[in-house]
Amino acid sequence: MSRGFVREGDQEEVPLVPQRAYLPAGVPNFVTREGLEQLLKEKEELISERENLGVTNENEKRIEQNYLNAKLHLLNDRIAEARVVEITVQPPEEITFGATVTLKTGLSGNMQTLRIVGVDEADIAQGKISFISPLAKMLINKKVGDKVTLKRDRQDIVFEIIGIECK
């Protein structure tokens, strides 16, 4: 787009806003109750940040407001599409969205606990994996004692399901 006939002050850059966690088109945005609360809290924080900008330069303030407005727009879209899945109504004997799963890893026998959550909630450091992740997709509808094999590069990793908790 040509920018030849604009005022000098109007030549600010459009803010680049990082996209939210990937959610394929047409896939419902399932979230846990905690996940929705987390999204709403993030919205409150962004609104507060936008209202309390410490920038005195008008041009910088407008750029920062545009950036925060763009982030809010993406967040509002995600909240509007959110579908809360009540974990307490899930069958306790099989893995479903929101379940916490204890796995034993193949030959090493290492134990690992993971919870299957929404894309915006996923954080492997906290043991939370997205329901669209390859491992979560393999675990859904499995039961205690079942095994799943995750194919990685040159190695297959076998996970045995040791426990399932829905709370």
Q: What kind of region is each of these model predictions?
A:
Residues 80-91:
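Active-site phosphate-binding and catalytic loops of NTP-dependent enzymes
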Residues 1-78:
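Helix-rich terminal scaffold detector
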Residues 119, 161-167:
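Short, compositionally biased
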Residues 29, 94, 157:
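Residues that recognize and position ribonucleotide moieties
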